[in-house]
């Protein structure tokens, strides 16, 4: 469920399949809609570190900013909370695996994340 009690997915399989994650349901912890494409500032890049099926990348491919310990090395896989991107393709519409972070500091710093539309936000799921 999201912060307002709307069901996002009934289980992990549905979460990584036909889920209910949209800009209107992928709310902040305060129950507010997260800024996306067309909003200022765009904050739709969400830190996930996940492949589209929800599994981790192989250990030789860092997609978690050195297991969430570095702001200068590695990159993080990002999803789009509004399910929109610069292209009309599957990756751009993915909530959990759209593109890696990037930027002048390497992709993981507070300075890097806004360059592609992020703010260091993450999803929180519980059952």
Which residues does each predicted region cover?
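Secreted/extracellular ectodomain signature
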Residues: 1-127
